[in-house]
């Protein structure tokens, strides 16, 4: 890995470490998403506690955390496998943010943002899959899992040279969802839009 790739990997992690959900909730004077609802600082939990506008803002910012470093690295001519490493770094920053006590989200939106520079056709297929599963079953985590399992196949169909880095990224997302997988099997996973909240954790 050359110096440019190393630099972009570090930048990707630091950018990913900016928790959009926590910052937007602070600005809007909403509860800390790490202490209410699903305790996950992501768009789905912010939807529960703050509504569609706040959730949309979080979704956009989280996607940009993946898009900006990967697109920049692509523009600089960094090879596909290393683009995957940079994408993973952005997602790791989101999952384990340096600036927020390593309490982060699941990385789905950031991963989507990281994949987006490959092409709008691939991005559209991924978003359509997530929306279809989410509408049918109303589980954000299930939609994410189905989508990331299919994403490498979609990539192989459209731009096969990026299949390995996308596959690496998708494996990380599946591992991060291990608790959601358990709750799906036990019937304890909250559905999209549920308003039932836990009391905020004491500081």
From Swiss-Prot:
This is Glycerol-3-phosphate acyltransferase. Probably interacts with PlsX. Pathway: Lipid metabolism; phospholipid metabolism. It comes from the Bacteria. SMART domains: G3P_acyltransf. It is a multi-pass membrane protein. It comes from Vibrio vulnificus (strain YJ016). Pfam families: G3P_acyltransf. Catalyzes the transfer of an acyl group from acyl-phosphate (acyl-PO(4)) to glycerol-3-phosphate (G3P) to form lysophosphatidic acid (LPA). This enzyme utilizes acyl-phosphate as fatty acyl donor, but not acyl-CoA or acyl-ACP. The gene is plsY. It is found in: Cell inner membrane. Belongs to the PlsY family. Its main location: membrane. One of its GO terms (cellular component) is plasma membrane. GO terms for biological process: phospholipid biosynthetic process. Its EC number is 2.3.1.275. Keywords: Cell inner membrane, Cell membrane, Lipid biosynthesis, Lipid metabolism, Membrane, Phospholipid biosynthesis, Phospholipid metabolism, Transferase, Transmembrane, Transmembrane helix. The chain crosses the membrane at residues 4-24, 80-100, 117-137, 139-159. InterPro entries: G3P_acylTferase_PlsY (IPR003811).
């Amino acid at each position: 890995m050359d110096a440019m790739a190393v630099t972009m990997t570090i930048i990707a992690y630091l950018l990913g470490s900016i928790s959009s959900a926590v910052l937007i909730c602070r600005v809007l004077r909403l509860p800390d998403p790490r202490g209410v609802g699903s305790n996950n600082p992501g768009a789905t939990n912010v939807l529960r506690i703050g509504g569609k506008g706040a959730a949309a803002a979080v979704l956009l910012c989280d996607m940009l955390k993946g898009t900006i470093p990967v697109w920049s690295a692509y523009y600089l001519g960094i090879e596909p496998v290393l683009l995957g490493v940079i994408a993973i770094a952005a997602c790791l920053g989101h999952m384990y943010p340096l600036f927020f006590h390593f309490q982060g989200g699941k990385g789905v939106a950031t991963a989507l943002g990281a994949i987006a520079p490959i092409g709008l056709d691939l991005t559209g297929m991924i978003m359509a899959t997530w929306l279809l599963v989410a509408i049918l079953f109303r589980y954000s985590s299930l939609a994410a899992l189905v989508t990331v399992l299919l994403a490498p196949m979609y990539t192989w169909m459209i731009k096969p040279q990026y299949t390995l880095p996308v596959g690496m990224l998708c494996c990380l997302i599946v591992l991060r969802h291990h608790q959601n997988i358990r709750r799906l099997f036990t019937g304890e996973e909250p559905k999209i839009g549920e308003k039932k909240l836990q009391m905020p954790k004491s500081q």
